């Protein structure tokens, strides 16, 4: 692999428009902590791997993408299958020449569905069971060799390819983006019309689920559980990239993504790390960064500070956050060397365009015999999307939610060739299939939750996303 650095004088989205289409991706950072929101990457896939119903399928678009075809078949866990794919491609690729790049050097880009938990957590005895109506893959990842990386801190674009011909192709894409040439625009007509919207749970059903969850809390089974419902929107002829552009405008975040798998698209803007690995001082670190506690931004600097104080003095928000930090420490502790787990940021405020969050940072040094795939398994799913204790909370989710979650509450991001991994929690995300858009919204249920208020919380979240679509139809 070779690398060419050029001045950053064009934005990632403009460059992505040059290649948009099936089997392309954009992972973009806009706001947040600089060490998190530093890189944006985009490219065309060499192939993709799909894990579903215990089986791995490999689709290749190039000769390189075909290298893992022999790995197709049954596996006990999608993470095991992804590891085998990663290791197979390492036989054919040399990343030693691009070591100066701190993060992504190529690898697997895609998503893990929440429902992969079923491969290592036994939920078979839970009744009633949610239905798997949409039948999304358990995991779906692009195979990425040649790509473009934007370093927002250094203000440079890294062109990374296997050979000079690949570099020239990436240069051509950048050049066309700079001069505004775009023969690749997808123009779809839109009409000003009422959206067709439906929820997989009625208000009465959701409120009953909250009441049942509170019974489990008072019985001592759990401290908290996150219950969610799914909203379906008919997208008609809407250009899906316009949805990403609007989400990017309204809710810029450290983790924004547009993954075009053809039949399926994953479009979102998540503020929260699920888990990531890093190297520092010859140590392999595993990191998670729980977010719990949110309040709006102030209209003035003075009001902003007052709202920050209000959030940090809210005993309910603080108690929930501390509980989730303890859960994160426990998860990270399973895979870290003894005595290395620490909370490096505790209950700090991070400010975004419209909201401010309470955030903590939990770090550990990864055990010698653990890789990024085992790190995901130990921390998946995020406590902020399941509850605590985590396994019992997931059992209650299984009982009370109507359908499988699919990508919602899982992870989206990458596994690098070099075992660096970075996954965001899949929230604030549109999942598109067969021209239907699905958005899942949840509420954290605790002992003093008021069922009506929890429904209203999901309604606020859901309608914010519906308005995003409505604004594109005017």
Curated annotation (Swiss-Prot):
Its cofactor is Mg(2+). It is an enzyme of class 4 (lyase). L-tryptophan binds at residues 29, 254-256. Its EC number is 4.1.3.27. InterPro entries: ADC_synthase, Anth_synth_I-like, Anth_synth_I_N, Anthranilate_synth_I_arc_typ, Chorismate_C. It catalyses: chorismate + L-glutamine = anthranilate + pyruvate + L-glutamate + H(+). Feedback inhibited by tryptophan. Pfam families: Anth_synt_I_N (PF04715), Chorismate_bind (PF00425). Mg(2+) binds at residues 320, 457. It comes from the Archaea. GO terms for molecular function: anthranilate synthase activity; metal ion binding. Part of a heterotetrameric complex that catalyzes the two-step biosynthesis of anthranilate, an intermediate in the biosynthesis of L-tryptophan. In the first step, the glutamine-binding beta subunit (TrpG) of anthranilate synthase (AS) provides the glutamine amidotransferase activity which generates ammonia as a substrate that, along with chorismate, is used in the second step, catalyzed by the large alpha subunit of AS (TrpE) to produce anthranilate. In the absence of TrpG, TrpE can synthesize anthranilate directly from chorismate and high concentrations of ammonia. Heterotetramer consisting of two non-identical subunits: a beta subunit (TrpG) and a large alpha subunit (TrpE). This is Anthranilate synthase component 1. It comes from Methanocaldococcus jannaschii (strain ATCC 43067 / DSM 2661 / JAL-1 / JCM 10045 / NBRC 100440) (Methanococcus jannaschii).
């Amino acid at each position: 692999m070779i690398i060419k650095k050029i001045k950053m004088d064009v934005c990632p989205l403009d460059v992505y428009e040059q290649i948009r289409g099936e089997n392309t991706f954009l992972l973009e950072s806009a706001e947040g902590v600089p060490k998190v929101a530093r890189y944006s990457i985009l490219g065309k896939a060499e192939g993709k791997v799909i894990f579903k119903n215990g089986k791995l399928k490999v689709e290749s678009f190039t000769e390189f993408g075909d290298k893992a075809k022999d790995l197709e078949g049954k596996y006990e866990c999608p993470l095991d299958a992804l590891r085998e794919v990663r290791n197979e491609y390492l036989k054919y690729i040399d990343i030693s020449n691009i070591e100066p790049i701190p993060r992504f050097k190529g690898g697997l880009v895609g998503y893990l569905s929440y429902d992969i938990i079923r491969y290592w957590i036994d939920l078979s005895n839970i009744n009633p069971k949610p239905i798997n109506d949409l039948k999304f893959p358990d995991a779906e990842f692009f195979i990425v060799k040649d790509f473009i990386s934007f370093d927002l801190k250094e203000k440079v674009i890294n062109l990374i390819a296997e050979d000079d011909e690949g570099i020239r192709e990436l240069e051509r894409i950048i050049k066309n983006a700079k001069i505004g040439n775009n023969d690749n625009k997808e123009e779809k007509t839109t009409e000003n019309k009422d959206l067709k919207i439906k929820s997989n749970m009625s208000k009465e059903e959701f409120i009953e689920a909250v009441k049942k969850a509170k019974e489990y809390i008072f019985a001592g089974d759990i401290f908290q559980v996150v219950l969610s419902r799914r909203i379906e929107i008919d997208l008609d002829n809407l250009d899906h990239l316009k949805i990403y552009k609007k989400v990017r405008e309204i809710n810029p975040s450290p983790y924004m993504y547009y993954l075009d798998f053809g039949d399926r698209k994953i479009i979102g803007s998540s503020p929260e790390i699920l888990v990531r690995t890093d190297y520092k001082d010859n140590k392999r670190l595993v990191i998670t960064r729980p977010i719990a506690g949110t309040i709006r931004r102030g209209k003035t600097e003075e009001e902003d500070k007052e709202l920050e104080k209000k959030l940090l003095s809210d005993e309910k928000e603080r108690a929930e956050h501390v509980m989730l930090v303890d859960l994160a420490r426990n998860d990270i502790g399973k895979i870290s060397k003894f005595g290395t787990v620490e909370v490096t940021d505790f209950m700090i405020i991070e400010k975004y365009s419209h909201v401010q969050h309470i955030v903590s940072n939990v770090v550990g040094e990864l055990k010698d015999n653990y890789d990024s795939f085992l790190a995901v398994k130990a921390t998946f799913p995020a406590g902020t999307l399941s509850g605590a204790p985590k396994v019992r909370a997931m059992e209650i989710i299984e009982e009370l939610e109507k359908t499988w979650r699919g990508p919602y509450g899982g992870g989206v991001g990458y596994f690098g060739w070099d075992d660096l991994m970075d996954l965001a929690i899949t929230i604030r995300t549109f999942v598109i299939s067969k021209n239907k858009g699905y958005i899942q919204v949840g509420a954290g249920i605790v002992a003093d939750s008021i069922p009506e208020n929890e429904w209203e919380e999901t309604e606020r979240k859901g309608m914010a996303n519906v308005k995003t679509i409505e604004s594109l139809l005017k």
